[in-house]
């Protein structure tokens, strides 16, 4: 059984190959990379707002929106979900040197 991320990504790829006139995914592909990137930025802002408002229900929805738009970007750039999963797998369990990372200032 395929997981929800795989099913979503396959649907997005199908829309890219066989556009449907009323499809939002098709709309994004027709507008191109700049529109897709703009939507990712907008959705990331909405994630921040939902988190700052302590609205977990809205936060979940906005994170799903970010993931969807990132998946559209992956399809636009011809990057497979498998490429992403391989990178996640490679990074999983690796030790990270916190001292090498720039400190995050409070907002």
From Swiss-Prot:
Its EC number is 3.6.1.31. Keywords: Amino-acid biosynthesis, ATP-binding, Cytoplasm, Histidine biosynthesis, Hydrolase, Nucleotide-binding. SUPFAM superfamilies: all-alpha NTP pyrophosphatases. The keyword Nuclease does not apply. Gene3D superfamilies: MazG-like (1.10.287.1080). It is an enzyme of class 3 (hydrolase). It is found in: Cytoplasm. Pathway: Amino-acid biosynthesis; L-histidine biosynthesis; L-histidine from 5-phospho-alpha-D-ribose 1-diphosphate: step 2/9. One of its GO terms (biological process) is L-histidine biosynthetic process. Disulfide bonds: none annotated. It catalyses: 1-(5-phospho-beta-D-ribosyl)-ATP + H2O = 1-(5-phospho-beta-D-ribosyl)-5'-AMP + diphosphate + H(+). One of its GO terms (cellular component) is cytoplasm. One of its GO terms (molecular function) is phosphoribosyl-ATP diphosphatase activity. InterPro entries: HisE, PRib-ATP_PPHydrolase-like. Its main location: cytoplasm. The keyword Cell inner membrane does not apply. It comes from the Bacteria. Belongs to the PRA-PH family. NCBIfam families: histidine_hisI, PRK00400.1-3. HAMAP family: HisE (MF_01020). This is Phosphoribosyl-ATP pyrophosphatase. It comes from Bacillus cereus (strain ATCC 10987 / NRS 248).
């Amino acid at each position: 059984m395929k997981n929800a991320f795989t099913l979503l990504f396959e649907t997005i790829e199908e829309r890219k190959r066989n556009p449907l006139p009323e499809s939002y995914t098709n709309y994004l592909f027709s507008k191109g990379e700049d529109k897709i990137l703009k939507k990712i930025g907008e959705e990331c802002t909405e994630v921040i707002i939902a988190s700052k408002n302590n609205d977990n229900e809205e936060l979940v929805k906005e994170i799903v929106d970010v993931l969807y738009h990132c998946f559209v970007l992956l399809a636009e750039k011809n990057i497979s979900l498998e490429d992403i999963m391989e990178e996640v797998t490679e990074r999983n369990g690796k030790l990270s040197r916190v001292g090498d990372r720039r400190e995050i200032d409070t907002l």
